[in-house]
């Protein structure tokens, strides 16, 4: 199983790249974890946000290919670490790749939401999209460590 994090936005601050890569490199070889960045549409005071969301959404879904789509969205389902570990095992047992989608400043397109088999909420708070990359990477690594009895996670 491969996990792909597909996120709108490029040129992240160095702390985001460093934080994400720290957890990415810890993943086992049999569960690769990759990041695909989708360039954000140009936004301005006269920007057609609906069109921008549609373009970003199409690019995200195209990057996902045949993987199971899971959106990261405030109205999604919150998972505890043990629940995320169970979810990780279920995805692994399904034998399919998983694509986690992080939208841009206005969120995800309706097409992305419609394509999603699941929606995961990290928090009822609105989080900065760059920070979400690091939180997701750490959360997935922690969940993996729980499934393998690795000492990283402690109750």
Curated annotation (Swiss-Prot):
Its subcellular locations are:
Cytoplasm
What Pfam families does the annotation carry?
SPOUT_MTase (PF02590)
Keyword Cytoplasm carried by entry: yes
Assigned EC number: 2.1.1.177
The record's annotation in CDD domains points to: RlmH-like
Where is S-adenosyl-L-methionine bound in this sequence? 72, 103, 122-127
Main site of residence? cytoplasm
**Entry's Gene Ontology molecular function annotations:** rRNA (pseudouridine-N3-)-methyltransferase activity
Source domain of life is Bacteria
Which reaction equations make up its catalytic activity? pseudouridine(1915) in 23S rRNA + S-adenosyl-L-methionine = N(3)-methylpseudouridine(1915) in 23S rRNA + S-adenosyl-L-homocysteine + H(+)
Q: Which UniProt keywords apply?
A: Cytoplasm, Methyltransferase, rRNA processing, S-adenosyl-L-methionine, Transferase
Q: Name one GO cellular component term.
A: cytoplasm
Q: How does it assemble?
A: Homodimer.
Task: Sum up the protein's function in the record's words.
Answer: Specifically methylates the pseudouridine at position 1915 (m3Psi1915) in 23S rRNA.
Membership in a protein family: Belongs to the RNA methyltransferase RlmH family.
Q: Identify this protein by name.
A: Ribosomal RNA large subunit methyltransferase H
- Gene coding for it: rlmH
